[in-house]
Amino acid sequence: MDLINSLLNFVVPPASLLMLAFTWPTLFFITTCEWLYNTYLNSENMENKVVLITGASSGIGEQIAYQYAKRGANLVLVARREHRLRGISENARRLGAPNVLIMAADVVKEEECRRFINETINYYGRVDHLVNTVSLGHTFYFEEASDSSVFPILMDINFWGNVYPTYVALPYLRESNGRIIVNASVENWLPLPRMSLYSAAKSALINFYETLRFEVKNEVGITVATHGWIGTEMTRGKFMVEEGAEMQWKEEREVHVTGGPVEEFAKQIVSGACRGDPYVKYPSWYDIFFLYRVFAPKVLDWTFRFLLTNGGARRTSFIGTGRPLLETSSPRRSAVMEGSSPRRLPPGPLTFSPAFQQQKSE
């Protein structure tokens, strides 16, 4: 057996690469034809369908809501910051959404997920797309974290905050032959410093949905969206740091990476979901790093060591401070995140994000 495995280890990788090189043009042609057909002839009509979006109070979730609104979908917007949802719901109505429900809820609690799913069914009678966008990152070296109580919070938000809504909504998605859209990240396989726990949670998330894809077969579609470095709250300060506080991001990473527009990523996600794409990748050129990780891991290791180290002492450079991420009396009780403690605020003035103003003028 050892001899056979040794032989296969030597023969299979180069033979597979050679076969892939010969079949790639044909596969690319087939994929392109499918994309054209699904884009122009078979794209799902979202008019009057029901789309539930978690983490809809900012960033990717907000922009996805606007994209579905332009397609005439009925929306259910879920987040902890209800005051933000009010303005976003008005923006969505102006962009074409016939009806918009907003609900304050914590997606890491199964009972609250059950509540907003049931309220959606009671009001609309169905749910067609479930869009999970909740996410929370961090910017610390794992060994330098001063409080390990933040570790479960990262897993709660990035993993269970997606799993619980999916678990509750799945029977209704089967009835409507609906779709689940997942906000993941290339960091599930691309090693970046200061993001170890976030990357681990995203890896668990993608493996969960890849397995679920086979379990639900063709009854429920699943679109996994992976993004590189884009301009969201996570790149503008919405991070968990060593001291357990929300702080403005300035220079946590050792290398500057240009962020792509979140509006474009949201547009690609919705278009891909309506086409029935299993994956949406933005930007797609990140895929090349995956090939290097599988077939030439040393090259990837050398590249990142060169790009992501500064040769000096580790540093964390912040400007400003925010509300406490963890309360002293209960270290896991709250986090400044998409899903912070349910604090009802009085109605404020209607807010319109700059991105909405730009979309409205187009």
Swiss-Prot record:
Stretches of the chain forming a coiled coil according to its record: none
Cell compartment(s), UniProt: Lipid droplet; Membrane
Enzyme class per UniProt: oxidoreductase
Active site positions: 198
Bridged cysteine pairs (disulfide): none
Membrane topology: Single-pass type II membrane protein
Enzyme Commission number: 1.1.1.146, 1.1.1.62
Motif (Proline-knob): 13-26
Segments passing through the bilayer: 10-30
Similarity comment: Belongs to the short-chain dehydrogenases/reductases (SDR) family.
PANTHER family reported for this sequence: DEHYDROGENASE_REDUCTASE SDR FAMILY PROTEIN 7-LIKE, RETINOL DEHYDROGENASE-RELATED
Domain note: The proline-knob motif may be involved in the targeting to oil bodies.
Descriptive protein name: 11-beta-hydroxysteroid dehydrogenase B
Record organism: Sesamum indicum
Protein encoded by which gene: SOP3
